[in-house]
Amino acid sequence: MANDKDIAAVGSILVNTKQDLTTRFRALFTLRNLGGAEAVKWISEAFVDESALLKHELAYCLGQMQDESAIPTLEAVLKDTNQEPMVRHEAGEALGAIGNPKVLELLKKYAEDPVIEVAETCQLAVKRLEWLMNGGEQTKDGTDENPYCSVDPAPPAQRKSVPELRTQLLDETLPLFDRYRAMFALRNLGTEEAVLALGDGLQCSSALFRHEIGYVLGQIQHEASIPQLQAALEKMDENAMVRHECAEALGSIGKEPCVQILERYRKDQERVVKESCEVALDMLEYENSSQFQYADGLLRLQSAH
């Protein structure tokens, strides 16, 4: 069991701007896995960083940890219009993931935010909290289990055929929450047919929606999605939030063609895309080596003594 001293040692790597971004990401994931108020405190301290990629990942981790001590930090990040939209969006999503209804009024306020990605995120988070408050987690009628350890912005839709779920996914007249439910139902199926249906979502009009498609394709890690992920990454006029998520998904799939694509974009002019490629390649290097675990902040500290 890690003590506060161990956590502080890993935390000091996370907040050290002189460290490589890849090393700091490893420290972040170590803190997420360790959990607890002290880990939350260290993660919260890194929101002053210049890297939007790192800050958005901080918010994501705080949401996944579901520790209510992170709520004040996440509220402050959501309110801070100097933070990049992708960071504010992730803070809003994390508040929904933690699931405490006390943030409902704040989320309703920011559901009207002038930044569309932030507004749509908060609309989804409001719907998720209302779903939780109505006992949604207790009633799992006809839905498939989430095979991943993620807290999602929407529950899966009830089990239907892939063509039916695809229709729900792509129907832009439906509320975003309902389309997200179809997205997570398709993800939970994880078949090639489901993956190809999800890939079609990369053509939809909402950048937030497209970036979430990239995220779930990264979770599934199915090679059938490589061409669509590559096409989105190569689209230079695509929203950087979408391109970065597609880069991370390619890294998650990790096949040789993915490595070649990531190598090509590790010098991209968009900082968040460039950094995503660097982090993804670092994760792949770990997976292809004999290193025991990616979130190895504590192991690295021990080997340095």
Curated annotation (Swiss-Prot):
Q: What are the EC numbers?
A: 1.14.99.29
- Cofactors per UniProt? Fe(2+)
Give me the ranges of the annotated region Disordered. Answer: 137-160
- Pathway(s): Protein modification; eIF5A hypusination
Give yes or no: UniProt keyword Repeat.
Answer: yes
Reaction catalysis annotation? [eIF5A protein]-deoxyhypusine + AH2 + O2 = [eIF5A protein]-hypusine + A + H2O
Q: State the Gene Ontology terms under molecular function.
A: deoxyhypusine monooxygenase activity; iron ion binding
Give start and end residues of every HEAT-like PBS-type repeat: 54-80, 87-113, 178-204, 209-235, 242-268
Keywords from the UniProt entry: Hypusine biosynthesis, Iron, Metal-binding, Monooxygenase, Oxidoreductase, Repeat
Which residues does the annotation say bind Fe cation 1?
56, 244-245
SS bond partners: none
Q: Which domain of life is it from?
A: Eukaryota
How is the cofactor bound, as the UniProt entry phrases it? Binds 2 Fe(2+) ions per subunit.
Q: Name one GO biological process term.
A: peptidyl-lysine modification to peptidyl-hypusine
Which EC class is this protein assigned?
A: oxidoreductase
SMART domains xref list: EZ_HEAT
Q: Where does Fe cation 2 bind?
A: 89-90, 211
Give the family per the record: Belongs to the deoxyhypusine hydroxylase family.
State its role.
Catalyzes the hydroxylation of the N(6)-(4-aminobutyl)-L-lysine intermediate produced by deoxyhypusine synthase/DHPS on a critical lysine of the eukaryotic translation initiation factor 5A/eIF-5A. This is the second step of the post-translational modification of that lysine into an unusual amino acid residue named hypusine. Hypusination is unique to mature eIF-5A factor and is essential for its function.
- Recorded protein name is Deoxyhypusine hydroxylase
> Lineage, please?
Eukaryota, Metazoa, Chordata, Craniata, Vertebrata
